[in-house]
């Protein structure tokens, strides 16, 4: 790669384990070079981490990074990395904590391609995941090492379930290693990247860190400076780790998200229990073969204390599920136990297991694995919403909600022990996660129930929410250390709940945060929270924010995103108006994703408005974008590809727009391929988990 222009530079050195000094230089426009320090420091950190974690030293004397401000491009060119400005520039005044995380993840990903992508690359397009899935796994490991591993894992799985699980369940389902493709751009999918990363992670779980490292070292030794296949990666991991991965390789060839059913039959008199597991691979033609599924598991007693999990062969940490049906006999159980399954999300599967609301609340309070603790809470929240949405329910259904409300109070009381994890444990799953549990889901009814449950929980814990909100205030200059960032995150979660109570004081506080809050994280979070409510404070906050930051394009993306995610009625029309305004440019990829990506991908309530306005708007946008940047259309259509999963009226309205797009002359091959898939593919049910 080559780049030329009137760039300013900022440089530093990294000294590797052999004592060699490597010059790192970031190039950007003069007006933005001051915002590149975090990027430069990230490059130093990822270089050091890759050498320590995987033994991969940088192989040149210098590394150049170009901040691209005019094109939507991030590339891992050897020695000259290109990064979009949206994923490269950050400063304490105008960037949120999430912006810093994004810079770290994207910059880390592109650097890590030096070994998994450049020195060892993929042989052909069908092997894309050997490069992208492996590197995505590595960038996740890097990000986890730089922050809270539990929170990073929760964030990763939340995104996986929202995007990739939906892809697996809809018209766009395809294997990680596809057998064919119509347009190359359609290969750059959540399945290839994110499910591909989860497959590598499963190998890591099965082998353990030391054997996995030996296998990856062997992979580099065998294939350095060579194009490779997925099979060659698996063979190196198997040979280096001393495992047979023949069955494991099926993960790359079978589409869909597997479902694992777990049942515990306990015999108190004999102090034993039968752990029964079955797996179901949702392949349309029933040709799916049993997969190798590593499930991290554990047991908790009735008071929340860990109980050793073992059989006649010894302690069990990971259950290696290889058969369609498998039974394990557990021994030495002196009390009734609750099963904690898929800790750390060790396998990308849906787990179905019978657990009461009280069991889930106990796990939410006492589980030692951060991810499993969060997952139990998400299940309890989903149950509460589903119970409230039942047509014969009068008011809020008490049973799951009572357990949730009490656990919520305990979480707030104990939140100071780990602000970052507490913020995740208290956060509700979005409406789409609830809708995925129901055939022919009525999103409008579920949205009403979702709001009712959140409002009930907030009102029942009003004083504790205010106490936690005020305790997380940090005086003095803005700090980027993990503790300060965690306090800001928890404070924002509390404010979001406080606004649900329709309290004038909460609205006034949120407006004050927008007007004079310390840092962009605080201001942006308050703006996003206010935008869900049709009130004077919302209008004032939007006006103040726009006037203050109108000259800062990256900050104004936050302003656009806040409105795109708004829950109150008429969202499609408001977003359409913004998209037609002079300030918006569809060809500007970061701006388009902030407004349109947020609305079409994330706003389940506004997009699925009963009048079909969201669907018509999406079809218009896809046809317009297809003429400008056809490779980008697929990123806006995940919800449209799930059109069969909603109630009859919404499904019909979505199908009408799909047929309109498909019947339009001159559309690109990529868009035509996706519309053909949408109309031809059957429905694959993929509930997120039932307990």
Feature-to-residue mapping (PLM):
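Beta-strand-rich binding/interaction modules
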Residues: 244-246, 255-341, 458, 462
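Zinc-dependent metallopeptidase catalytic helix centered on the HExxH motif
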Residues: 55, 91-154
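Conserved hydrophobic/aromatic pocket- or pore-lining residues that grip, position, or stack substrates
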Residues: 50, 83, 113, 135, ...
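Hydrophobic helix-coil surface modules that form long, contiguous segments used
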Residues: 1-108, 137, 357-358
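Amphipathic alpha-helical substructures
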Residues: 181-274, 386-410, 632, 646-655, ...
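Acidic/His/Gly-enriched intrinsically disordered linker/tail segments
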Residues: 132-198, 202
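Active-site-adjacent bridging/hinge elements
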Residues: 18-23, 81-82, 105-115, 165-180, ...
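Long, ordered, helix-rich scaffold segments
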Residues: 162, 189-190, 331-691
């Amino acid at each position: 790669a080559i780049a030329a222009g009137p760039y300013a530079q900022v440089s530093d050195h990294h000294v590797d384990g052999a004592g060699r000094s490597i010059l790192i230089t970031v190039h950007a426009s003069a007006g933005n070079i001051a915002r590149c320090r975090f990027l430069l420091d990230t490059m130093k950190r990822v270089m050091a981490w890759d050498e320590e974690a995987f033994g991969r030293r940088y192989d040149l004397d210098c590394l150049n990074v170009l901040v691209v401000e005019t094109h939507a491009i991030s590339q891992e060119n050897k020695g000259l990395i290109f990064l979009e400005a949206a994923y490269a520039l950050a400063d304490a005044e105008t960037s949120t904590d999430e912006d810093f995380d994004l810079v770290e993840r994207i910059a880390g990903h592109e650097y890590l391609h030096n070994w998994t992508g450049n020195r060892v690359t993929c042989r052909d397009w069908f092997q894309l995941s050997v490069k992208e899935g492996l590197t995505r796994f590595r960038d996740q490991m890097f990000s986890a090492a730089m922050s809270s591993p539990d929170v990073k894992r929760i964030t990763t799985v939340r995104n996986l379930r929202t995007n990739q699980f939906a892809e697996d369940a809809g018209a766009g389902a395809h294997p990680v290693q596809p057998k064919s493709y119509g347009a190359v751009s359609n290969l750059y999918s959540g399945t290839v990247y994110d499910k591909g990363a989860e497959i590598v992670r499963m190998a890591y779980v099965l082998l353990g860190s030391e054997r996995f490292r030996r296998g990856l070292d062997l992979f580099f030794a065998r294939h350095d400076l060579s194009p490779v296949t997925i099979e060659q990666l698996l063979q190196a991991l198997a040979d280096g780790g001393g495992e047979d991965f023949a069955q494991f390789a099926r993960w790359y060839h079978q589409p869909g998200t597997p479902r694992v059913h777990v049942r515990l039959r306990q015999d108190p008199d004999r102090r034993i229990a039968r752990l029964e597991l079955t797996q179901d691979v949702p392949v349309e033609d029933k040709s799916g073969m049993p997969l190798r599924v590593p499930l991290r598991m554990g047991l908790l007693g009735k008071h929340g204390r860990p109980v050793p999990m073992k059989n006649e062969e010894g302690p069990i940490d990971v259950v290696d599920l290889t058969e369609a049906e498998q039974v394990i006999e557990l021994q030495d159980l002196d009390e009734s136990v609750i099963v904690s399954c898929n800790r750390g999300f060790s396998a990308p599967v849906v787990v179905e297991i019978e657990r009461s609301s009280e069991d889930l609340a106990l796990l939410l309070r006492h589980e030692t694995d951060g991810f499993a603790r969060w997952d139990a809470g998400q299940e309890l929240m989903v149950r509460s919403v589903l119970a409230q949405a039942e047509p014969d329910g009068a008011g809020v259904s008490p049973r799951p909600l009572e357990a949730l409300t009490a656990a919520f109070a305990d979480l707030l009381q104990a939140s100071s022990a780990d602000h970052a994890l507490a913020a995740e444990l208290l956060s509700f799953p979005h409406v789409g996660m609830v809708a995925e549990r129901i055939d022919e889901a009525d999103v409008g009814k579920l949205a009403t129930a979702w709001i009712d449950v959140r409002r009930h929980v907030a009102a029942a814990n009003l004083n504790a929410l205010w106490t936690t909100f005020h305790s997380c205030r940090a005086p003095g200059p803005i700090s980027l250390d993990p503790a300060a960032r965690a306090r800001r995150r928890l404070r924002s979660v509390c404010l979001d709940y406080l606004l649900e109570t329709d309290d004038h004081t909460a609205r006034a506080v949120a407006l004050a945060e927008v007007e004079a809050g310390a840092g962009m994280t605080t201001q942006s979070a308050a703006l996003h929270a206010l935008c869900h409510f049709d009130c004077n404070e919302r209008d004032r906050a939007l006006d103040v924010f726009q006037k203050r930051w109108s000259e800062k394009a990256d900050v104004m993306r936050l302003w656009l995103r806040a409105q795109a995610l708004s829950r109150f009625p008429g969202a499609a029309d408001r977003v359409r108006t913004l998209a037609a305004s002079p300030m918006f440019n569809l060809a500007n990829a970061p701006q388009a994703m902030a407004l349109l990506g947020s609305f079409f991908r994330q706003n389940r309530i506004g997009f699925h408005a009963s009048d079909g306005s969201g669907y018509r708007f999406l079809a218009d946008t896809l046809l317009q974008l297809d003429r400008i940047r056809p490779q980008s259309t697929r990123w806006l259509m995940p919800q449209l590809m799930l059109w069969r999963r909603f109630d009859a009226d919404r499904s019909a309205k979505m199908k009408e727009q799909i047929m309109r797009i498909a019947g339009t002359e001159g559309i690109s091959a990529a868009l035509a391929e996706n519309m053909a898939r949408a109309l031809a593919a059957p429905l694959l049910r993929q509930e997120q988990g039932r307990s």
